[in-house]
UniProtKB/Swiss-Prot annotation:
Top-level taxonomic group: Bacteria
Transcription is among the record's keywords: no
Name listed for the protein in its UniProt record: Putative methyltransferase Jann_4284
Pfam families: Methyltransf_21 (PF05050)
Source taxonomy: Bacteria, Pseudomonadati, Pseudomonadota, Alphaproteobacteria, Rhodobacterales
Gene3D superfamilies according to UniProt: Vaccinia Virus protein VP39
EC number(s) per entry: 2.1.1.-
GO molecular function: methyltransferase activity
Primary enzyme class: transferase
GO terms (BP aspect): methylation
InterPro entries: FkbM_mtfrase (IPR006342), SAM-dependent_MTases_sf (IPR029063)
Keyword Transferase: yes
Source organism per UniProt: Jannaschia sp. (strain CCS1)
């Protein structure tokens, strides 16, 4: 992480500047970022408002290992957080970048476009899709969010039947979006980092797209949302010969005798086709 610290970065009005020099508009999450507006954050130990040291280190390892170009596919990209951070880090190393994101909320897509442009990332260097990542093509119902920057954890309804779609239309509660597979989004190109944060459907996505993952993806970084999913993902990927590089378990609280997620977990796996990194 220290290798990527932007020592020359300075604070700018109206944005929060992080340790990579990435500028983040405060309006993407006003309840947290308004108070930090115009500041430059320090090194994130143990973390910052966005992620902890485990996720930062896991993601940056993929940039460190890249040679002449860098491609990230962020599934559930929100405001383009990992696209922006890894894109800036890769460009600082002189790498050609290709940033691919899919997100269910259109307002978050607009935030992502703004954040990427604010950080000098040009239109030909990124691809954003308003849709839902899935194991197969079809339709999903995505909740209409009240202030998406302040509401996370929205779960789509995958492949709903006609009655469910009709009820959602009548209630005005969801928007209908296309489902995209990994192959749809990547166009068959190799991926340095697949970042998956899709609120509980991460296991289905990984299993359903694993043929493409096994041939295209060098590393997969997963934000987990239950201990069950962590264990199931670990078993599946380890059984396929993938190497575990980061394991920071989800933190749960006990609510009425049931675990409730408080902090997402972090898993990083390396493809068996990739050599062990040299530090």
């Amino acid at each position: 992480m220290r290798e990527f610290e932007a020592h020359g970065a300075t604070a700018s009005p109206g944005v929060v500047t992080n340790f990579l020099g990435v500028r983040i508009p405060s309006d993407i999450m006003p309840s947290i970022l308004k108070s930090l507006e115009g500041q430059k954050e320090g090194f994130p130990i143990p973390g910052n408002w966005h992620a902890d040291i485990a996720e930062w280190a896991a993601a940056l390892l993929s940039v460190r290992e890249a040679k002449t170009s860098y491609r990230i596919l962020e599934v559930g990209c929100g405001w383009g957080c990992w696209l922006s951070n890894m894109g800036v880090a890769a460009k600082a190393r002189g790498l050609k970048i290709d940033l691919i994101g899919v997100e269910g909320d259109q307002q978050n897509i607009e935030h992502a476009k703004h954040t990427l442009a604010l950080n000098g990332i040009e239109a030909h260097e990124f691809q954003l899709t308003n849709g839902v990542a899935s194991a197969r093509n079809g339709v999903a119902l995505f909740p209409i969010l009240d202030g998406p920057g302040e509401v996370w954890g929205a779960e789509p309804i995958f492949h709903p039947d006609a009655e469910t779609i009709s009820k959602a239309r009548a209630a005005g509660s969801h928007t209908e979006l296309k489902c995209y597979t990994l192959d749809d989004l990547s166009h068959g190109k190799p991926i340095d980092l697949l970042h998956v944060d899709i609120q509980g459907s991460e296991l289905d996505f990984v299993k359903g797209n694993f043929d493409e993952i096994s041939t295209l993806v060098k590393r997969i970084l997963i934000g987990t949302h239950s201990r069950y999913l962590e264990g199931s993902l670990q078993k599946f990927l380890l059984d396929q010969g993938w190497a575990l590089e980061m394991d920071r378990p989800a933190i749960c609280t006990n609510v009425a005798g049931k675990p409730q997620i408080a902090v997402d977990g972090v898993l990083l796996f390396r493809s068996p086709t990739m050599p062990h990194p040299v530090f």
